[in-house]
């Protein structure tokens, strides 16, 4: 414990996930929704920022049985969360990539008393003029530029760029290295693949998938998948 009374993380090289004593010192329990690869990255950010003591939630017991999740408290159904936390509710963070899964988990946990929190890496660059909704993941070295807007529950992954005046809808997944250029607009539940580029002013509808490395040069209607250069 430091001079100011805050718990200190274990020494460099020690697994934060495995250190139960460190978690027990954190007063707030924080539900982590998802138990896959992205959840590992979210756990690291939670622990680095001392956001709270992780409690895992995933509806697949086999996922929770794998390390590092097997070392943490966990639940597999919403009623169990309600029983544990009671009427006071609980904070949660989304820890999956898929737009559909993010939306489903968000709705399910809110329905049993959860309230969403965002996880934003300290290395991310976020403009003071950007508008960020609740329940976001903003990962390492992401850029969210001036007057950008991001809807609730979206994921901006590592080194993704949202440039000036862009608008990203709800529960979107902006994959690593993707670039959404000035004043482009994405609908809800859009997945932008790694390294893809959406050119300035382009409009992308709801439930669209943009393939990795694609360059989107024209507007995209709802519910389609586009890929290639130019994206079709």
What residues fall within each predicted segment?
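Short amphipathic alpha-helical segments
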Residues: 43-45, 69, 104-108, 150, ...
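Phosphate-bearing ligand-interacting subdomains
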Residues: 64-125
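Hydrophobic, well-ordered beta-alpha structural blocks that scaffold small-molecule cofactor pockets
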Residues: 2-5, 9-66, 74-83
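Short loop/helix-cap segments at secondary-structure boundaries that form the rim of catalytic
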Residues: 62-69, 129, 218-221
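Glycine-rich hexapeptide-repeat left-handed beta-helix
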Residues: 35, 93, 158, 167-170, ...
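Short alpha-helical
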Residues: 37-40, 100-101, 131, 215
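Left-handed beta-helix
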Residues: 12, 98-152, 156-166, 178-180, ...
């Amino acid at each position: 414990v430091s001079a100011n009374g805050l718990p200190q993380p274990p020494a460099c090289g020690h697994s934060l996930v495995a250190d139960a004593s460190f978690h027990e010192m954190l007063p707030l329990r924080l539900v982590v929704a998802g138990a896959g690869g992205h959840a590992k990255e979210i756990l690291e950010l939670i622990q680095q920022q001392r956001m709270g003591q992780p409690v895992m939630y995933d509806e697949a017991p086999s996922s929770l049985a794998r390390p590092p999740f097997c070392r943490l408290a966990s639940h597999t159904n919403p009623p169990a969360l309600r029983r544990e936390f009671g009427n006071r509710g609980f904070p949660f963070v989304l820890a999956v990539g898929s737009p559909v899964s993010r939306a489903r988990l968000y709705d399910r946990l809110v329905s049993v008393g959860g309230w969403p929190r965002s996880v934003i890496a300290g290395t991310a660059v976020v403009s003071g003029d950007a508008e960020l909704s609740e329940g976001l993941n903003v990962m390492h070295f992401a850029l969210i530029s001036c007057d950008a807007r991001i809807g609730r529950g979206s994921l901006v992954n590592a080194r993704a760029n949202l440039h000036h005046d862009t608008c990203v809808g709800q529960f979107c997944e902006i994959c690593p290295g993707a670039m959404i250029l000035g004043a482009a607009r994405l609908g809800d539940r859009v997945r932008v693949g790694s390294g893809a580029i959406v050119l300035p002013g382009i409009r992308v509808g709801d439930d669209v998938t943009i393939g990795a490395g694609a360059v989107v040069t024209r507007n995209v209607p709802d519910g389609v998948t586009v890929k290639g250069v130019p994206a079709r």
